[in-house]
Swiss-Prot record:
Motif (DDXXD motif): 87-91
GO molecular function: metal ion binding; pentalenene synthase activity
Keyword Nucleotide-binding carried by entry: no
GO biological process: isoprenoid biosynthetic process
Native source species: Postia placenta (strain ATCC 44394 / Madison 698-R)
Annotated motif NSE/DTE motif, positions: 223-231
Function, as annotated: Terpene cyclase that catalyzes the cyclization of farnesyl diphosphate (FPP) to pentalenene as a major product, as well as caryophyllene.
Name of the protein in its database record: Sesquiterpene synthase 14
Length: 351
């Protein structure tokens, strides 16, 4: 018997994506400000905060909003910290508890100046401060679109918790439909829309909506390829396209990777074709819409680069894995399901 760990091959899905990597020049300064604000709440244990910091969510925001001003980038950095805190806090809870958390956050974004009650989950005050600061620099239309997208995202997090409670594994189509919301892509477009005045007729036009969902799917596929190893190790891989494809088509992991890479190519082509079908709404709106579509188009590259540049999925070996495309299968680890909220365990990956 060989002691060598099994190696997983990660297909190079982004090789032909036309948009390159950009990063905001204000990255280090704004990340430091946002992280200092976030850590001031002491949302995690010392050990989990170290693991959270290695994820470098400020880098994710700086890759996603490379042309943003310092003020707008701060909104992006704060939002990424809020997103992943929601992710960590809700991943270990049952649907009824998640519903309660989500209702707090929905109340916050609709009432950002309302003081939060004593003893409420930290999610309330952290989200309130993020949103109160964000709206100072956001157009009314971008605020409205964010509230709608963030509410859809939050409700889908409850759905994911119900699936977890019932040990329910979806079909590919059903998974992608719900995951398009709970990957958090739509609200993540908001920091790029902060200064735009896109009317609903343009923002919610079927072609634009479809393009935004194409991008969400590309993010899902690349996220699930990168996160599968960590998730199978911690026993949290039911909500992953690779697990679903393996079960639905009765194939192994290698064949599932090939299937996902092929589907990724199809979605890329849908997006590129869809861009040619954008209607005109007049010169002023068209210029803003072009800026918004560019913000969507760079997200898959952002996500792919961050998967390897941060320590979230590959520890300190991300850039090496990005080159070789091979990663050793991590051994199974036990996490303590009784540790919640501030005590939640944020897993540290070490390949």
């Amino acid at each position: 018997m060989s002691d060598q760990p099994k190696m997983i091959y990660l297909p190079e899905t982004m090789a032909n994506w036309p948009w390159p990597r950009y990063i905001n020049p204000h990255y280090e300064e704004v990340k430091a400000e946002s992280d200092a604000w976030f850590k001031g709440f002491k949302p995690f244990t010392k050990q989990s905060q170290v693991a959270f910091d290695k994820c470098d969510f400020g880098r994710l925001a700086s890759l996603a909003y490379p042309w943003a001003s310092k003020e707008h980038l701060r909104t992006g950095c704060d939002l990424m910290n809020v997103f992943f805190m929601i992710d960590e806090y809700t991943d270990v809870e049952c649907a009824s508890v998640v519903r309660g958390m989500v209702d707090i956050v929905i109340d916050v974004i609709n009432n950002p100046h309302k003081p939060r009650p004593e003893g409420e989950s930290l999610l309330g005050e952290i989200t309130r401060q993020f949103w109160e600061r964000a709206i100072k620099a956001a157009t009314p239309s971008s605020q409205k679109h964010f509230i709608e997208a963030f509410t859809d995202y939050l409700n889908s997090v409850v759905e994911q918790a119900a699936d977890r409670d019932n040990n329910h594994i979806r079909t590919v189509d059903s998974y992608l439909k719900t995951r398009r919301e709970n990957i958090g892509a739509r609200p993540s477009y908001f920091p790029a829309e902060l200064g735009l005045n896109l009317p609903d007729e343009a923002f919610y036009h079927p072609v634009v909506t479809e393009l935004s969902y194409n991008i969400a799917e590309l993010i899902i596929l690349d996220n699930d390829i990168a996160s599968y190893n960590k998730e199978q190790a911690t026993g949290d891989d039911r909500h992953n396209i690779l697990t679903i494809v393996m079960l639905q088509f009765n194939i192994d992991l290698e064949a599932a990777m090939t299937w996902v890479a092929s589907y990724h190519k199809d979605v890329e082509n849908k997006f590129l074709d869809g861009m040619k079908k954008l209607p005109s709404f007049g010169p002023v709106v068209d210029k803003e819409l072009e800026e918004y579509i560019l913000a969507l188009a760079i997200w898959p590259r952002t996500n792919d680069c961050w998967n390897f540049e941060s320590g979230r999925y590959f520890g300190s070996k991300g850039l090496q894995v990005q080159k070789t495309r091979y990663v050793p299968l991590l051994p199974k680890v036990k996490t303590d399901p009784t540790l919640k909220q501030k005590q939640v365990v944020v897993s540290l990956v070490d390949l």
